[in-house]
Amino acid sequence: MAQSSPQLDIQVLNDLQQRFPEIPRDVVSQCMLQNNSNLDACYRALTQESCKYLYMDYHNLDETRMNSNLLHINLGIHPSSTYHTGDGAQVNGRPLVHSSSDGHIDPQRSPGKLLCLVPEPQSAPAVVAQNYNQFFLNDQNRNSPTPPPQPVQQPGVGTSAMQASLPTYMHVPRYSANPITVTVSPSGHNVPRALQIVPQVQNNPYGTPIYIRHPSQNSPGRQTQQNTAWPPSPQAVLPHYNPCPPYPQSFQPTQYSPKQPQIPQSAFRSPPTSQCTSPYSSPQHQVQTNQLSHQTSHVFLPPSPSTVSPHLYQQAPPPYPKQSSLGYLPYGPGLNKGPMNKIEITVESQQRPGPTLNRSPSPINNQSAQRSQQHPVYVSNARSGSPSRGIPTQPKASYSGSPLFITYSQPPTTTGSPTPSSRVVMSPSNPTVFKITVGRAPTENLLNIVDQEQHPSTPEPIQPISLLPVSGGDKGIHKYHRSSSSGSDDYAYTQALLLHQRARMERLAKELKHEKEELERLKAEVNGMEHDLMQRRLRRVSCTTAIPTPEEMTRLRGLNRQLQINVDCTQKEIDLLQSRGMAKLDVKAMSNFYDNLSPGPAVPPNTCKKESSETTSGERKARRISVTSKIKSDPPDLQAPSSLDIGPWQRASPRPGRDEDFEGSPWNCNSCTFLNHPALNRCEQCEMPRFT
């Protein structure tokens, strides 16, 4: 392998492989070898290669046989030196993109290998510009305008949007390649009759064969291969046409733009149609030509009888100023089965562009403003009543560029109506002239999918794909018939609409879920508030019922009166002590608070002397007389514990009394009234100083 070479940097290879996972490792290593492991050069080269692998535009034969949904047919001008009939890789010009979902065309079995099968993306158009937003929305979720055009480049230097994604083996043509998309829809039974346009002069190096097929009648747009009307296997061999077209007999000069030279365009005559055979039989087709003039050597147009109601085409096509009108002629059962006597293809030049249209059937932006000579063609044969079309009965010129103007001319001797209708009586003796006029169409807004004149707000809803066109008679529901066009424009537009609607559905579902959660939260909050209200009501009811009885009220009134008496006695005692003066008070005499406490190890012993105890007993007697003048029951209670408490303490602590006399008397704190040891200078409880 290439990555095993010594000059390859494995770290750079891994970085590039991680940056571009869609590109195979051998391709990345080969790119590194070609660029001498230059990271910038490899990054630029792999960025260009990444588009091909992301959108599957590389030419893989095995995958092409299985996954091909598009038919690229190169049309246009290419130098004779690079034109080889046996190698499809050397064919240059304008690639023709055609949907071939119902079957498969094997490019290896075609005589000239002029078919390049490219798988079609499932969610994007076949040709997408670099600055194109496929969801039709900008950041503000509005219909975004047409993307700004790129700067104008030289005709021989710039490449189109499709060329940027073409395989590397494709030679860049001298003239800009313009994509052509052919979209056909089945509208009738398959009849093995084809219209062939074959020139009469040989060896034209500027021609390219065109092979156009179209899905079967039963196909609703995208089907599997078991419903195809022709063999999907590689055994489906194309008829052998001459890939080298002859030089034309007559020329008609045409000029499309100031930067483009006049290239001759010829008028062709076709041999009898019965002489050409085709393995494909498909209904009504519509071919489109591009604005870059070129020689078309073979045009394979297989029309068949159409079952479309005549009223779909009875309305005259809308006139456009300074150009031909666009008309559709379905092949009816009354048309001539014999050969077409004359087929004329003319190219008209337009002097002044027409008014700007306001609709586009496809979301593809081909950047037509890059070069003045580039005018991509994008014409669809989808029914006008298709959901992607806004006007039910009026076909209009589509994408900016050169639409295909098909005009059917019948001699006046024919008994049929000369107006475009599906029922035209013809006979083999009457010569028929089938004219194909190609002219320039006015530029239109690319992203205006909805017709402004009829549907200014919302597009018509997408009908189910299973609604196929039915035979005549149902004139009232033809507007809702889903066209079974399998072109990339309808498919990409439908997929984009479905994606957009799916996103809207998900967003609405998310909003609905959020609203449901909000509703549940509000319900829970309301339930909680109701519960609190009920609890308050219950408490209020219980409080009103718990009224005390008269006996309880009498007891409470007696307790309240007793408490008031005790408060009054305490207040009078305080007043009496204040009247005697705080300086005369003996701290030891007021130590009855500590005497009434239960004895414990932390409580200091009582150090009152006998004389002090006598003085204290006298003061207590006087206080008891003054306080208990109103309450007669208190003196026995107060006298008994005091006499009982003082006696035992004085008898039980003779030795601690001597020790304390030796150390000094304890002092009482003025702030907390705590009796402290005489050796302490600060209160043991509140840390207040002894002498203030």
From Swiss-Prot:
GO MF term set: ubiquitin binding; zinc ion binding
Purpose: May play a role in signaling pathway.
UniProt KW DNA-binding keyword: no
Keyword Transmembrane helix in record: no
Zinc finger motifs (RanBP2-type), residue ranges: 662-692
SUPFAM superfamilies found in the cross-reference section: Ran binding protein zinc finger-like
The protein, known as: Mitogen-activated protein kinase kinase kinase 7-interacting protein 3 homolog
Biased composition (Basic and acidic residues): 608-620
One family name in Pfam for this protein: CUE
Coiled coil spans: 496-580
Keyword tags: Coiled coil, Metal-binding, Zinc, Zinc-finger
Compositional bias of kind Low complexity: 409-422
Example GO biological process: positive regulation of canonical NF-kappaB signal transduction
Region (Disordered): 138-159, 206-333, 349-427, 598-662
One cellular component term from this protein's GO annotations in UniProt: extracellular exosome
Polar residues bias spans: 215-230, 249-298, 349-387
Domain CUE: 8-51
